[in-house]
Amino acid sequence: MSFQQPSNGAQGGNNNALEKTSSNEATSSSSTQVSSLSASGISVSTPRVSPFEPERNMQVQSSQHLEANVQSPVSSQTTYATPSAYAVPQESEIELHESEMVPQKPKKKKRSRRNRKASRKKIPATQSSSADMDTLHVCPTCGSCSDSKKPQSNKKHRGRRVKHSPKSTLEVPDGIPDIKALSASMGSSSQHASRYNEGRGSFDTLGTHYHLSKSRKSSSSDSLYSVSSMSIKNDSNSDSLSSSSSSDVSGSDENLPIDKTLYLSVEDPSFMVHPRRPSATKSCSAAVDCPHTTIPKPPYQSDTDLTELPTKSTAQFSDETFTVQPRLKSTHSSIADNEDREVDSQVDENTRVVEEDVCFPMQEESHVNKGIDFDELDNFAEEELQKQRQNTDHFRSRQYSTCKPFEPHWNDLSPHDPNDPSSSLHSNNAEKAAEVPLRSSYYSGGRRSVTSMSDSPYRFSFFSSNQNETIHASVLSDLLDDGATSFRSLFCPEKGVWWLDCLDPTDIEMRVLSKAFSIHPLTTEDIRVQEAREKVELFGSYYFVCFRSFEQDPELANYLEPLNMYIVVFREGLLTFHFSSATHPASVRRRARQLRDYVHVSSDWLCYALIDDITDAFVPLIRGIETETEAIEDSVLVGRSEDSSDMLRRIGECRKKTMGMFRLLYGKADVIKMLAKRCNEKWTIAPTGEIGLYLGDIQDHLVTMTSNLSQFEKILSRTHSNYLAQLTSNSIEENSRTNGALGKITLIGTLLVPMNLVTGLFGMNVPVPGRDTNNLAWFFGILGVLLGSIAIGWIITMRYNAF
């Protein structure tokens, strides 16, 4: 830690001789100390002294004098007090803060006329104006508290009053045995570091330069940097630091070092405001605890070479701080930078998102087919068991389903003899199997994360070809037996081909299964996002099949809605994933148990059986559509007009069902064809050749059903058009009949018009011809005229075919 030598002011115009004498003494003393330090092996640099900058020269020589005093042993005759005005923090504790970087012209102290006259004169470097120096108080404990005001008696932790002697000799208060100890204690208080240099700071930048002054205001920053450089020399190489510090302060127009420079290319000096100054009566404990004073040193900062320090954007220079506010036009750029930093921080924090990307490389163990990672499954099961132990309400839920004869999806309509033993055996097995709940009555609409197991008790089903029972569990860890601790007991080769069926797996379960079975991220992504496109993909250790089924329960609102079935086939077994309950896994398991004594139940065969069961599920619906189409076609020809509304409804529902089935079946034949082609190409991972024969049969069924649906759609479309045309013709006939009836009514009205006229005339209270006669000649004459006119009108109407 280094100190600046305070200079005593001149005492008027009559003290010139005294000033010169003290200046010479200080100069000689300074040179003597420098020479002694040089003799002892310590490099001391002598900065350049300019006669035109008295205050600059005073500061530089004072810095040099104090540098030599700090590095030399403390003598018993000359002791230096340590006012906090010179307490400069160490380099590791200096930080540039953006909120404290706004310079403002400090308030000038009112000086007397006598002092102003003295300040105009050239004062030697060892002297200064008495008006610029107040009585200083040094804290005996930490040496960092100082105040220019008069101390109060009731204040604790205050230093004693120390006055400077004319010989620039200061007394060290009690409690500070060594200058190095004092500098260490004063290094944590950065807010009192440049209290004496108030109003003398300059702020030079490499971009837009802010030259507040040339001579007076640049000395504080240079001297501060020189003092900080000298303070670091106590701990590191003094030779390099002394040379660097002397070169930095050699001229007033030179730029600051890199660590004190700010690159402000868009800022404007007009936006500078001075920050609020801290209280001058702050205690030493508050100063030490201040967050701006104890700044950790960055790991890349060097203590021996200040020129290699990285450029910082903010700085803290104790009380003389600067705050530079950018222009308004650059606000959008700063906002964009903040957003970029926020995005980068979020990306750094969410490393799991990066690992879930499909392009993230798989582990080295996953590139080689080494079977199943049982450690991953065991760790996940252990975590689930710990969660279950913490939750007292949860209990392990396991269920075993027994064997049931395989039943096709369509009903056998052939007559059965009640005395036939085979039919009675079939009914007994059906009754026994009905007691075992093989399908839960719950449905999960859409993709969701399972948080409660109450609505889906059995989401995992484990099947082995050599066992008669299927294990059903609500969570993955419940598949293990009570005494088992590893999944190796489930996936052992002695149990045959394994099959793990997963209903609505969560993201964590998908991640664990993908890692345990070395599933490619592309496959995992297709399963998680529920890819709807049907396809077949071959990977290193498995092939992936996406096949769609439909909801078969007519009582549900989403009846006939698509249901995606994802099949991952390995050589040792297969994994199936679906996000809605389905009967296909249970049907395939029953079929595998019945045929395991006659066929080789492999993973390829289970995949074929599952695809075949999904394909067979369309058969009853297509037959029903065929029957409905024929009935509608017949009803259109013989149907009554009263049944028109019901017929249109039937046609609409049948067409909707037909198009739904056609949309589900469209593309399945191509998938099966591709899978069968892989079998014939002798792929290592593809299904075997005998499975290709059965896949060809499935392809034929799919092509037949697709063509039938296409024909049904054409029939229904034509029937719909014919029925609409028939309804139109019937409507036209009805309109023509209505028009004929209206024409007749119009004719009758026209014929009765003359009769109304005649009867109206005779009914009036006017003289009528033949009123005075006593016979009926006039009456019958008028009646005959009316009847004649009616006859003539009728003849004319019939002649010209008016109706």
From Swiss-Prot:
Broad class of the protein's primary localization: cytoplasm
Coiled coil ranges: none
Keyword Metal-binding belongs to the record: no
Bias-annotated ranges (Basic and acidic residues): 406-419
GO CC field: cytoplasm; plasma membrane
Residue spans of biased composition, Acidic residues class: 337-347
Family as reported in the entry's similarity comment: Belongs to the CorA metal ion transporter (MIT) (TC 1.A.35) family.
GO biological process: intracellular magnesium ion homeostasis
Modification sites for Phosphoserine: 318, 449, 452
Domain of life: Eukaryota
UniProt-listed Pfam families: CorA
Biased composition (Polar residues): 1-20, 58-82, 420-430
Annotated spans, Disordered: 1-255, 326-349, 406-431
Membrane association type: Multi-pass membrane protein
Keyword Transport: yes
Composition-biased stretches (Basic residues): 105-123, 152-166
Localisation per UniProt entry: Cytoplasm; Membrane
Biased composition range(s): Low complexity: 21-45, 181-194, 218-253
Protein name listed in UniProt: Putative metal ion transporter C27B12.12c
GO molecular function terms attached to this record: magnesium ion transmembrane transporter activity
Keywords noted in UniProt: Cytoplasm, Membrane, Phosphoprotein, Transmembrane, Transmembrane helix, Transport
TM spans (from-to): 745-765, 776-796
